[in-house]
């Protein structure tokens, strides 16, 4: 990845609210299925905005820090997804998204961020990201002191 896109907590909350607005009315949904781990925080934000209490997870491992590797389903929510929102933080190459579509063909699959290769696999997203860009999510970062340039 040649570029980085840094996401702050504030940005994430703003984008999640935009996505939640598009998912109204809330009473059309039975619940939310979060794709672990990237979709966990966005699912909490959507659940709050939409007043949804039924939140489940599908646990798929497809990244090893910044490298994609073999995909493995560790846990899945029951059913075909009918009446459920499935959320992940982003759709990248589409590998995870294809697995989600196979598991939950009737779900409404959304992400906050979408890269060109994966975009056709989601029903909705908020932000376009170039394919060669790595997204730094706020839960992966910490605040660090940076000394002044003058050294004083």
Curated annotation (Swiss-Prot):
Q: Which residues bind Mg(2+)?
A: 89
Q: Which InterPro entries match?
A: PRibTrfase_dom, PRTase-like, Xanthine_Guanine_PRibTrfase
Instruction: Name the coiled-coil region(s).
Output: none
State where 5-phospho-alpha-D-ribose 1-diphosphate binds: 37-38, 69, 88-96
Q: What residues bind guanine, as annotated?
A: 92, 135
Record keywords: tRNA-binding included?
no
Q: In which pathway does it act?
A: Purine metabolism; GMP biosynthesis via salvage pathway; GMP from guanine: step 1/1; Purine metabolism; XMP biosynthesis via salvage pathway; XMP from xanthine: step 1/1
Topology relative to the lipid bilayer, per the entry, is: Peripheral membrane protein
Identify the residues that bind GMP: 69, 92-96, 134-135
Could you tell me the keywords of this UniProt record?
A: Cell inner membrane, Cell membrane, Glycosyltransferase, Magnesium, Membrane, Metal-binding, Purine salvage, Transferase
As for subcellular location, the record says: Cell inner membrane
Q: What class of enzyme is it?
A: transferase
Write down the EC number. 2.4.2.-, 2.4.2.22
Q: Which cofactor does it need?
A: Mg(2+)
Pfam families, sorted? Pribosyltran
Amino acids binding xanthine: 92, 135
The record's listing under NCBIfam families reads:
PRK09177.1
Q: Which HAMAP family match?
A: XGPRT (MF_01903)
Q: What is this protein's function? A: Purine salvage pathway enzyme that catalyzes the transfer of the ribosyl-5-phosphate group from 5-phospho-alpha-D-ribose 1-diphosphate (PRPP) to the N9 position of the 6-oxopurines guanine and xanthine to form the corresponding ribonucleotides GMP (guanosine 5'-monophosphate) and XMP (xanthosine 5'-monophosphate), with the release of PPi. To a lesser extent, also acts on hypoxanthine.
Designated name of the protein: Xanthine-guanine phosphoribosyltransferase
The species this protein was found in: Pectobacterium carotovorum subsp. carotovorum (strain PC1)
